[in-house]
Amino acid sequence: MRILLTNDDGIHAEGLAVLERIARKLSDDVWVVAPETDQSGLAHSLTLSEPLRLRQIDARHFALRGTPTDCVIMGVRHVLPGAPDLVLSGVNSGANMADDVTYSGTVAGAMEGTLLGVRAIALSQEYEYAGDRRIVPWETAEAHAPELIGRLMEAGWPEGVLLNLNFPNCAPEEVKGVRVTAQGKLSHDARLDERRDGRGFPYFWLHFGRGKAPVADDSDIAAIRSGCISVTPLHLDLTAHKVRAELGAALGVEA
């Protein structure tokens, strides 16, 4: 099985090293094409205004000055000697759940693999802060992902669907199981922090806040909060089919 790895935290990210160890438990045909720098929050963006610069690190490791989407395209269309059987994106430092999947470069890497006709899985590891220090239990994803991915590949899933895996913030032995979940919903509060530079000109920092919101029992959020691994199938068809039918009826047109 040929596996292509990417991420959005960059070629030197610890999560990518974890992902490679996971992949090597599944196959010895593993390739890495990852961003040269951190591309977090760039979602499914492409680099169109400048050329893509590819740097070969060794025989099967490449860094690209581009987004996770660029990396998957580069891997599938140029770097690999043949099409991969699986694209793995991650392991992200921090969960990618609920509405946050729309911002996630990690999820976008898997999305691009899916668009290119390759089975694809995004992996993210929840963490906590100790003071101002981020504590990420990478060993949890590393311990549980290989077997889970193997089982998922054996089970299979339809074309046009990617799998989004999130691992809870706990030790490997404390994981309480696996849940197949729905994408949850978070309360959304984007705000701007305006400041002034040395010449008095304004600049801004973007901040995201989270208020309290009901959490559905079958959601990715609920699974992670309960100490379970969340497996969420996401499809590329964004059509709201029920609303489409309702609007067609309201307008008296075919839908």
Swiss-Prot record:
Its cofactor is a divalent metal cation. The keyword Nucleotide-binding applies. It comes from Brucella canis (strain ATCC 23365 / NCTC 10854 / RM-666). It is an enzyme of class 3 (hydrolase). NCBIfam families: PRK00346.1-4 (NF001490), surE (TIGR00087). Pfam families: SurE. Binds 1 divalent metal cation per subunit. InterPro entries: SurE, SurE-like_Pase/nucleotidase, SurE-like_sf. GO terms for cellular component: cytoplasm. A divalent metal cation binds at residues 8-9, 40, 92. Its EC number is 3.1.3.5. PANTHER family: 5'-NUCLEOTIDASE SURE, 5'_3'-NUCLEOTIDASE SURE. It is found in: Cytoplasm. Nucleotidase that shows phosphatase activity on nucleoside 5'-monophosphates. It comes from the Bacteria. GO terms for molecular function: 3'-nucleotidase activity; 5'-nucleotidase activity; exopolyphosphatase activity; metal ion binding; nucleotide binding. Its main location: cytoplasm. The lineage of its organism: Bacteria, Pseudomonadati, Pseudomonadota, Alphaproteobacteria, Hyphomicrobiales. It catalyses: a ribonucleoside 5'-phosphate + H2O = a ribonucleoside + phosphate. Keywords: Cytoplasm, Hydrolase, Metal-binding, Nucleotide-binding. Belongs to the SurE nucleotidase family. Disulfide bonds: none annotated. This is 5'-nucleotidase SurE.
